[in-house]
């Protein structure tokens, strides 16, 4: 697709960008946050819920859909959009990250990667061409190349080998891609090495993909290292193409990523912490299970106008979580997704008015981020999924 991305404005005092991404299922205003619906659903929400909070782009995961229900079934149903009754934009991850998180359950060679299904133990083999074919059959608007995501503790030689294999696979994915209505994005690797990140960005930029993602970050490393790597890497990617930072979704991280020049974000964080009773607010995350909320008559977030905050007291939400009622998870998820959707709209408006830096400073002056040590501990636990299942 020609002219798939238009850069409308760049901040005069940072690298924050305001743009528009055009796809077969509509226009996306950037910078944008995409909720994750790995298995063709954003957990606990309907498409109508997402639209009600102005979400028009979500992510689904090819690995999970390949194993269950299977790509042929979704194709027979008319593609992923019809299968899940979603007429907005869908970005599909190739599943590379999930496959490589299987560690001892997978083996790779230059041709592709073999792995054992976490569902039934069967052995599967996927090539870069397969990853492209699967995503074309799904009919997503944005597809990702198959990449090798090295472990956060990988040696320099292992990171180099993973980067070089990622480059070769990206080239094969590009050659195999034939669906003109779908954008294929490359994924920059290189660990935390500035030199390897530069090499990866420059090589993939030379292949002229419609967009570029930064993979292999936000895997438990300190946040200052994450964003130092992001800022460095983006210097070597074309300004006229969208930049996608994978796996980032905390409010403070979205602000920092935007200031670096990132256009697209995705993360399971808002939905996952919602199901654990954490509600985003302008002051930081609020734990609804705290006894202080047991008798609070007003909404948990007085500044929020989402369905949850308009209709339910904090005391009621506290009760639902204490009783482990399913409605608790749904109402918390609606709130967290609405919070991030509103935050991204405010970010876009501030870039348009060239006051993003003031907006960011004002937000962070009141917002209390999660303790860094706790965040890293949670991240490491989440990276390995549950019951042997790779992360969503």
From Swiss-Prot:
Residues 247-253, 271-275 are annotated as: RNA binding. Its cofactor is Zn(2+). It is an enzyme of class 2 (transferase). It catalyses: 7-aminomethyl-7-carbaguanine + guanosine(34) in tRNA = 7-aminomethyl-7-carbaguanosine(34) in tRNA + guanine. Keywords: Glycosyltransferase, Metal-binding, Queuosine biosynthesis, Transferase, tRNA processing, Zinc. Zn(2+) binds at residues 304, 306, 309, 335. InterPro entries: ArchSynthase1/Queuine_TRR, TGT, TGT-like_sf, tRNA_ribo_trans-like. GO terms for biological process: queuosine biosynthetic process; tRNA wobble guanine modification; tRNA-guanine transglycosylation. Homodimer. Within each dimer, one monomer is responsible for RNA recognition and catalysis, while the other monomer binds to the replacement base PreQ1. Belongs to the queuine tRNA-ribosyltransferase family. Catalyzes the base-exchange of a guanine (G) residue with the queuine precursor 7-aminomethyl-7-deazaguanine (PreQ1) at position 34 (anticodon wobble position) in tRNAs with GU(N) anticodons (tRNA-Asp, -Asn, -His and -Tyr). Catalysis occurs through a double-displacement mechanism. The nucleophile active site attacks the C1' of nucleotide 34 to detach the guanine base from the RNA, forming a covalent enzyme-RNA intermediate. The proton acceptor active site deprotonates the incoming PreQ1, allowing a nucleophilic attack on the C1' of the ribose to form the product. This is Queuine tRNA-ribosyltransferase.
């Amino acid at each position: 697709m020609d002219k798939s991305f238009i850069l409308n404005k760049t901040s005069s005092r940072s690298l924050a960008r305001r743009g528009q991404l055009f796809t077969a299922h509509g226009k996306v205003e950037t910078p944008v946050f995409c909720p994750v619906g790995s298995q063709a659903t954003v957990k606990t929400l309907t498409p109508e819920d997402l639209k009600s909070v102005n979400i028009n782009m979500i992510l689904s995961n090819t690995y999970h859909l390949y194993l269950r229900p299977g790509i042929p079934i979704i194709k027979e149903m008319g593609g992923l959009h019809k299968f899940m009754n979603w007429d907005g934009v869908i970005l599909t991850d190739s599943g590379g990250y999930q496959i490589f998180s299987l560690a001892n359950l997978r083996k790779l060679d230059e041709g592709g990667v073999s792995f054992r299904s976490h569902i039934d133990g069967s052995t599967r083999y996927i090539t870069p061409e397969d990853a492209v074919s699967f995503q074309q059959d799904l009919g997503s608007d944005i597809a990702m190349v198959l990449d090798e995501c090295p472990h956060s503790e990988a040696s320099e030689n292992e990171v180099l080998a993973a980067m070089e294999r990622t480059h070769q696979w990206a080239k094969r994915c590009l050659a195999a891609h034939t669906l003109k209505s779908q954008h294929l994005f490359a994924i920059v690797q290189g660990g935390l090495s500035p030199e390897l990140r530069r090499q990866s960005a420059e090589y993939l930029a030379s292949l002229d993909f419609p967009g570029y993602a930064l993979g292999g970050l936000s895997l438990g490393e300190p946040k200052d290292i994450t964003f130092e790597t992001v800022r460095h890497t983006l210097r070597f990617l074309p300004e006229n193409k969208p930049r996608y930072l994978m796996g980032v979704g905390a409010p403070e991280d979205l602000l920092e990523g935007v200031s670096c020049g990132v256009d697209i974000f995705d993360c399971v964080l808002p939905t996952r912490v919602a199901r654990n009773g954490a509600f985003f607010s302008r002051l930081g995350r609020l734990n609804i299970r705290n006894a202080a909320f047991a008798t609070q008559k007003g909404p948990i977030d007085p500044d929020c106008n989402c369905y949850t905050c308009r209709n339910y007291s904090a005391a009621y939400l506290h009760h639902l979580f204490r009783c482990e009622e399913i409605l608790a998870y749904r109402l918390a998820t609606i709130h967290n997704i609405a919070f991030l959707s509103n935050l991204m709209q405010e970010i876009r408006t501030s870039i348009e008015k060239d006051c993003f830096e003031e907006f960011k400073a004002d937000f962070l002056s009141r917002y209390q981020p999660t303790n860094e040590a706790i965040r890293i501990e949670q991240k490491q636990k989440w990276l390995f999924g549950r019951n042997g299942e790779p992360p969503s």
